[in-house]
Amino acid sequence: MVSIIEVTTKRQLRQFVEYPNILYKDVPQFVPATFDDDMSDWNKKKNPAFEYCEARCWLAMRSGEMVGRIGAILSHKANEKWHTNRMRFTQVDFIDDEQVANALFTTVERWAREKGCDEVHGPLGFTDLDREGMLVEGFDRRSCFFTYYNHPYYINHLTRLGYVKDVDWVENLIQVPTDEKIIERW
């Protein structure tokens, strides 16, 4: 059985922030976020987005082991700007398990309904300058620091839950010449 626990303590927040490092520990393509930045994101005193956002985050637990995490953000500013009524999901990570995925997204969807939102959209951050998006191809390439890495199975779980892709974002790698003669010319 999966239990969903709302993050209310600093210890739980540390678990929430550290979870991707555990889930992807054997994945060389994963680039971890900066621990202090992620901790600050959820600190109302340090993140100015809390002036116009409401946010909550949860841990998924099974038999005392963490098996997933998800955050939810209600950005009043973004909804006003884009004329939407959306709840954002963010920082979602989970094992390949239908019950875990269901429990995490059901929790966000429930809060979205309580707040009167029409839809859940993501993964997005507090602002449009935060990490966003979900990897749908290129799992064999090192992820970028500004985007999320996720396992390929996420797509199947989100599709099964009724989520659809909103937009394609393309990330490119530019090789910078290291030949001294070329560099001197510039």
Regions found by a protein language model. Name each.
Residues 1-45, 169:
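Short amphipathic alpha-helix that is part of the acyltransferase structural core
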Residues 41, 135-138, 181-183:
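Short low-complexity, flexible loop/linker segments enriched in glycine and/or proline
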Residues 43-59:
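A short helix-loop-beta-strand connector motif used in the catalytic cores of GNAT acetyltransferases and
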Residues 148-186:
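Acyltransferase donor/substrate-recognition loop-hinge adjacent to the catalytic core
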